[in-house]
Structures are given as C-alpha cells and as structure tokens.
C-alpha cells in the first residue's frame, strides 16, 4: 500500500492523461470529480512530460507566425508557456536553438525594416538580448560556436561587421525557421502519445532483451570487479611493503649517521623484499650484495618488463569453406564467423602468431579483394542484416589497423569505393559507421588512397558532418577530424578546402573549443596546413580568425599555446614557407613509416551473444573450419627508429588517433598482448611505457604513432600517434 501512495499522484495522472487522449469526456469528468471529492492529488504533467494540449498544431502555427512577424514578446511567451522548462534548461539542442532565436529577434529590425529601423525599438531588442546573454545565455559563453555573438550588443553596426556577415545572408533566417519547425514538430509529436500507451508497448519483448543485456553487462562488470579487486589487493600489499622498507631504510640512515654499520645480510634482506616474487628465491643465496652497485643494479633489473613468451601458432583454417559460408550461410552464422575471424586477429599475440594469422587471411584472399565474382565476401558491407554489416565493418577496420592489412585492402580501389559508399549511406548503426570511418582514416596514411579520397569529395562530406560535432560519438569525432587533417596535408586537399574556405574555417574554429581535447592536435594541424593557401588566409583574416585564436591562448596549456602561435604566424604570413606545399606528383608508397595499431574499440559493445550450445569465437573456427597448411609465414620486417615530432608545432604528417581515447598504448612491435586484449574487453589493458614522438618534417608520408593519454595531453598540439614506438620496417 505504501508504494501505491508514494506514486498515487503519477498513477492517477496516467489514467487522466489516457482518458483525455481517448476522448472519454464524461468518464474524465466523473474521474476528476471523484478524485477531488476523495482528496486525491492529480499530477498535471506525467513524469515531467510535455503539456498535453489538443491545440498543439495551433500553438506551432502561432510560434512560427510570431517568428515570421518578429513579435518577440508573443513568441517567447508561447515558448516558455508550452515548452517545458525541463527541456529548455537541460536539452542542448533546445538551448542552442533558443540562443539563435534570440539573435533572430535582436537583429530583426536591421534585416526587415528597409535600412531604417525604429531606434527606440531596436535599442529595446538589443537590451533584451543583452539581458539574455547575461542570464540564461551565459551558460553557452564557453562554447566557441556562440562566443562571437556575445559582442553583438556592443557593435554599432552589426550588418557590416565581418563576424556577423552570416547572420545577414538571405539563407540564414529560412534555415533557422526550418530548425524551429522541426523542433516543434518533434516536441509536440512526443506530447501526443500518452505515457500509459508507451508503457504498454514497451512491456514484453523489449524488457526481455533489456534484461538479457543487463545480465550480460552484470556478468562482465563482476568479472572486471574481481580482476580490479585482485589488482588492488596486490597494489595495497606492495604499498604496505614499500612503506615498511622505507621506514627501515630511514632507521638505517639514522644509524649510519651515528656511526653504526649496515651489514650485508641486512641489505640483502631489504633487496629481496623489494624484488618481484619470481626473483626472491633465486637471489636470496646466489647474489653477493657486498659488492658495490649490486643491489641497485638488481633492483632496476627487477623492474624491467618481462619478455613475451613464445606462443604456438593458431590452427590452420579451411578458407574455402569459410568464404562459402560467409557468402551463402545464414545471417547469424555470417555474423559469428566475422566476429570469430576478427577476434583471431585482435586477441592473437603480437609477433609471429599475429603475423601468421594476417598472412593467412591475405594469402587466402579472405575478403575476396581480388575476386571478380558477382557475389563476394566484400559485398557483406551492403548486407540487409545490421549485425552482418557491422561485423564486416569491424573486420575491415581490424585489417586496416595493420600495415600489411592496409596494403592488402588498398590493392583494389573497389574496397575504398565500397567503404565510402557505406559511410555516406549508413544512418542506422553508429558502430558500423564508426568502423568504416576508422578504416578510411587508416587508409589515409597511404598516398594513393589519400588522392582517391580527395578526388571523391570526401573532404566536403567530412566538413558537413563536423558542422554539428555534439551529435557525434567520441570515436566518430576524433577519426573524422584526423581524416580531414590527413587529407588537408596534401596540396590537392588544400585546394578543395579553398572552394569552401569560409565554411571550413568556421567548422575548424568551432572545433577548437570543443570539450573533447583529443581532437585539438588534428584541428591545429588542419588549420596550419590550409592557411598556406593565400585565399584561405584572406578569408580567415576577414572573419577575425586571429582574435578567435588568441582567445584560446589565454586558456590553453604550453604546447597548445605554442601551436596556436605557429598558426597565427602562418595566418599573418604573406609568402608560402619553403616546403609547406607537398607535391602530389609522387604516388609511391613509403611503407617504412606505415605502422600497426590494434585499438580496444574494435571489440567493444558486441552486438550478438551465443545462445546455450551455440559455437562462437575460436571454438567455432576450430570445430567447423579446420584446414591443412593454410598458414603461410612471412619474414618479419625489422624496424628502425621512428621519425618523431615536436609538441611545439602543428601536425604536418598523416597520422591516426590510435589509442588516444582508450589509453591502451602500443610500443614498437609490442602491440596489445592476448592477456591485455582480453582485459580490453573488460576495461583497459595495462599501459606500456611509450616513447615520445619528436619532430615531423613536411613532405614525408605515412607515419602513425600512438601515445598514452598523459603523453597526448602533454603534447596536445603534437602528432597523434598510431604506434608510439613506431618503427620503420626495412
């Protein structure tokens, strides 16, 4: 009974709302009357939902009419009366729309009074806008998109000011009106569905699926919790041990000052306590700690990372049967096979095991990149099944994460064309688009593919996508900005940007202030690159780009500040710097700087789960698809020291985001181990120390490195890396 009383008002409100919706007028009157007689509270709005108004269409028309006529008071009275405060105050899209609506009414007289606005009314509108900026609109003052408009009330003639040129274009008001109409349609459409009906529809199958997902998430969370608890207990024990040893060492130092000697036995006991468990027994009686330097040398040696153990090769597979089932099998089988093939690559040990897996895929043409048949494995990118499309995109992205995999995929331009088509068409599944975008971004490390993407107009598509960065996932945002930067480093790409210079500069300036700081190196690199074009420099000066950049100098860290200073210097230069423009004539590949990365995102948020008795993963492959001698080894390429970059300068070389977001770094050939890969599914692998990249020069190509989050933030304008110990293969 207590639960009923606690929610009585909302429950009665649900009934009242449905009776009103179904037009049970007499029943509704009787119900309301009886509730009043019994003193039962009636919730006016259910669950904070929108006001239910039978005249919602009329309200929409009145709002649009007030917008068209410039009736500011009527518009905002209707706006505040019929759009719930829960949406106006918390929804970012509603807040942005309201900001632009205030601008619309503030400049309405300037646009539609024939050049002779009523001065008193104009001052009142500007004053109203200023009050809004100082109160409710103050929350958006940290957003780059709106920053210039805070100066609007103080500009004598906004119509001629370059920062506000866009507001007075003929297309600005119709575009804003269209956004308003879409917003109102969405809001009032939601208001017309009674919550009782929604609850009824959602009951049943949706709840069952959600319970299964929650159960799976609970199991994974419990596994992670156990792993973290063990790690925590070990760290706590090590910490207590260190504190104890430290206290003893302090006592020993004090004793030494008093003239007492430290015995070799005591020194040996302290060192053994500090060594790893594996070394304690062997060292206790075999090392002479009386020799000077022995103890410190052994301590440092105990901290060295363990060498990777030799691991066996994975069993050979029957690739003919695999490809046949990938083409003709059921959608569920296709999805499980694609998942298993990806896992075989992502969870294999770096080194010979992973290289053998990759070479087997390539030598058996797993994706039919060289096939001319009408039906091929590649066609799965256009499957009607969402799971198959997504898992195919994940596998392609995994292959593109490795240099040899990129070379395999790049040999046929149809792979690039299919990925570009999937990228532009995929609007249902976010993860599919993320993986397609990730693969294309890694493709952009190779010059011929850069050229093809530029010719295909991908730069324009990326600019359009990045106009609304808040609607994008972190992965999509980072990889799209990094891809845009890589394409902008080519002279052909810069010339493409010059065709839409104003829009390109606006998008990049908005991204400078985005809350995702991982994109800053790519934004800075793109800006620095395109500002080598005189026409883009002129456009940037006209829009006050230097003032915008200096705003960020006040808030940025040291590396960010130095990078922005480089960009400002480029902006104010008159002549092109030597070597800035890179020739497009040479399309030869330089694979010496094409590196490997296997980020944990490849295996995140798995869409399918095996049912009881259903095979998946490596067990599916080795049970149903064992082959004979299909693994073909290949001599491993040995690397040289990587070309490095300086955190003081903007990026000038093609890169890929790699492990910036996940914080799972890669060092040289030591990619994520199988143990770390498994941990990556439950969280994040142990970080491996990374080398800091140092000094990229213009005109070379295909470097990709990777850094830990800390190293990225300490070099925010430095090059994002695909493999931090990036090595040049001979």
UniProtKB/Swiss-Prot annotation:
Annotated ranges, domain LisH: 7-39
Domain of life, per lineage: Eukaryota
Disordered: annotated span: 675-730
SMART domains documented for this protein: LisH
Coiled-coil parts of chain: 205-242
Location in the cell: Cytoplasm, Cytoskeleton, Cilium basal body; Cell projection, Cilium; Cytoplasm, Cytoskeleton, Microtubule organizing center, Centrosome, Centriole
Main location class: cytoplasm
Modified residues annotated as Phosphoserine in this record: 583
InterPro entries per UniProt: ARM-like (IPR011989), ARM-type_fold (IPR016024), ARMC9 (IPR040369), ARMC9_ARM_dom (IPR048959), ARMC9_CTLH-like_dom (IPR056327), ARMC9_LisH (IPR048957), LisH (IPR006594)
SUPFAM superfamilies on file: ARM repeat (SSF48371)
Keyword line: Cell projection, Cilium biogenesis/degradation, Coiled coil, Cytoplasm, Cytoskeleton, Phosphoprotein
Keyword Repeat: no
GO biological process, one term: cilium assembly
Phosphoprotein is among the record's keywords: yes
Annotated GO CC locations: centriole; ciliary basal body; ciliary tip; cilium; cytoplasm
The protein's role, per its UniProt record: Involved in ciliogenesis. It is required for appropriate acetylation and polyglutamylation of ciliary microtubules, and regulation of cilium length. Acts as a positive regulator of hedgehog (Hh)signaling. May participate in the trafficking and/or retention of GLI2 and GLI3 proteins at the ciliary tip.
The protein's assembly and partners: Interacts with TOGARAM1, CCDC66, CEP104, CSPP1 and CEP290. Interacts with NDUFAF2.
PANTHER family in UniProt: LISH DOMAIN-CONTAINING PROTEIN ARMC9 (PTHR14881:SF4)
Protein name: LisH domain-containing protein ARMC9
